[in-house]
Amino acid sequence: MKWLKHFQSLHTKLVIVYVLLIIIGMQIIGLYFTNSLEKELTQTFKNNISQYAKQIEINIEKVYDEDNAINAQKEVQNLLNEYANRQEIEEIRFIDKDQIIMATSKQSTRSLINQKANDNSIQKALSLGEINSHTVLKDYGNGKQRVWVYNLPVKTSNDGTIGDVYIEADINDVYNQLSNINQIFIVGTGISLLITVILGFFIARTITKPITDMRNQTVEMSKGNYTQRVKIYGNDEIGELALAFNNLSKRVQEAQANTESEKRRLDSVITHMSDGIIATDRRGRVRIVNDMALTMMGTMKEDIIGDHMLKVLKLEEDFSLDEIQENNDSFLLDINENEGIIARVNFSTIVQETGFVTGYIAVLHDVTEQQQVERERREFVANVSHELRTPLTSMNSYIEALESGAWKDGELAPQFLSVTREETERMIRLVNDLLQLSKMDNESEQITKEIVDFNMFINKIINRHEMSAKDTTFVREVPTETIFTEIDPDKMTQVFDNVITNAMKYSRGDKRVEFHVKQNALYNRMTIRVKDNGIGIPINKVDKIFDRFYRVDKARTRKMGGTGLGLAISKEIVEAHNGRIWANSVEGQGTSIFITLPCEVLEDGDWDAE
């Protein structure tokens, strides 16, 4: 169907219109020319025949005016014989007033002389004395042909009609001549049309070429290519249109570049936003979602694109789009229960100037940490209040007992005062621990580091506890080579005191505390392991023992004088030394506390070099 497409092109249509206009024009001109030429030729032909008839009439009048009636017929015959060789004249007859054929120019019809002519046109000419003519078809042996019959009455000087000059003239030559002229005209028209078609293609091309270029450029623009330009062929309207089209293409290219730039910028902003973004169409179907939203919800993009936003956020049973549009409040949602992520969701509506809603946007702000901090703050306040209330209540009870007269009892009074002092010391330890944690949270706790021989440092701490705890066996596995580390001795002493004290407190039976120190020279790290044979910690609670005020067995810990802050302080101190502390425990088999710290093995002479 390629030819059909070419036939329907503007170029071909212009050529066809151009050719049709030429054909119509040539037809009109040809029709007018043919009609005019036909009239002119036939009129000329008839005028010539009329002149012949007039000459014959004049001569016949002379013959009859001379009163030579005896020789009149012979002279008329001689006169007609003179016109016998005229090409356009087929036959000339002279009929007298009695309609008797007196003479004829045609040899083959002389047998009709002295016979009566019954032609109506002859009767009309003789009876009315008027000229008449008409065209008939006659066959002279060569087929039927047009014959113009002309009747001219012959009158004497006294207006008496003496006869009729009857002429049959072959007018077919005139029409043959017209036919030849028409053929020449048709051939000329055909040649003109051929030239017109050829010129039309070139002329139409001057119009359609810029339009074709603009069409091709439009196709390229639809594909996103705005670099091509339409060639300007002149300063006419087509040229102005091409110039305007080039300007339009340039502006569209600039606008597209700006749009793409803004889109990339917007995509980059949405992608790297710390908040999750979900954008929908006007029906609430998810069309855009950024990586943060996918991470928060723990899902894949292809799993939610096209789904309803309320279904994705698990709100379809509680709200509708209309309610969200009317309600500007935010919501707290457990956006990912598996990960424990809580998000604050804010909704906004995309509205056109006409008020038509085109979509919705949901902004997911991760408030998990905030909620956890708030929860920990409430728990912290509750724990501090509880830890202070217990000794204060106990002290208040003993003071009331002393006020009631127990101070007079020599046996009870010292016991009450001893308990009051212990509770006071416990509150002082609690407040001191809280102050230390507060300083570390505010990074106002000063850490004074110095390079120490860790072997000597840890052995000194173990020796001290070993001397005071006669019922506990201490097992050491410390490398013989010297290990140096940069620490704050006082702060790290506090850490190991807390860990060792807990190990001794919770050991049972034949109490045993093991110390293992291993060095990783490749990473310049060392690991200290303190293991007891105590009651152990449930596996689901191991990670929580470093939380503030957390106790596995609250009653037992409080009975042993613990504040629940020792390991929390130890964790802060270890992390301040770029270290790490964690626990590993099997319930009923004991607990191991692991501490990693930076270290360095110094060769002999390194101290002197410094």
Curated annotation (Swiss-Prot):
Every PAS domain range: 262-333
Domain PAC: 326-379
Residue intervals of the Histidine kinase domain: 383-601
GO cellular component assignments: plasma membrane
Entry's transmembrane regions: 14-34, 184-204
Gene3D superfamilies: 1.10.287.130, HAMP domain in histidine kinase, Histidine kinase-like ATPase, C-terminal domain, PAS domain
GO molecular function, one term: ATP binding
Location relative to the cell: Cell membrane
Annotated InterPro entries: HAMP_dom, HATPase_C_sf, His_kinase_dom, HisK_dim/P_dom, HisK_dim/P_sf, Light-responsive_reg, PAS, PAS-assoc_C
The EC number(s) this enzyme carries: 2.7.13.3
Mode of membrane association: Multi-pass membrane protein
Catalytic activity: ATP + protein L-histidine = ADP + protein N-phospho-L-histidine
Residues bearing PTM Phosphohistidine: 386
PROSITE patterns: HAMP, HIS_KIN, PAC, PAS
Domain HAMP: 205-257
Post-translational modification: Autophosphorylated.
Class in the EC hierarchy, top level: transferase
Keywords for this protein: ATP-binding, Cell membrane, Kinase, Membrane, Nucleotide-binding, Phosphoprotein, Transferase, Transmembrane, Transmembrane helix, Two-component regulatory system
A biological process from GO: osmosensory signaling via phosphorelay pathway
Pfam families noted in UniProt: Cache_WalK (PF23846), HAMP (PF00672), HATPase_c (PF02518), HisKA (PF00512), PAS_9 (PF13426)
Job description of the protein: Member of the two-component regulatory system WalK/WalR. WalK functions as a sensor protein kinase which is autophosphorylated at a histidine residue and transfers its phosphate group to WalR.
PANTHER family per the UniProt record, alphabetical: SENSOR HISTIDINE KINASE GLRK (PTHR42878:SF7), TWO-COMPONENT HISTIDINE KINASE (PTHR42878)
Listed name of the protein: Sensor protein kinase WalK
Gene name linked to the record: walK
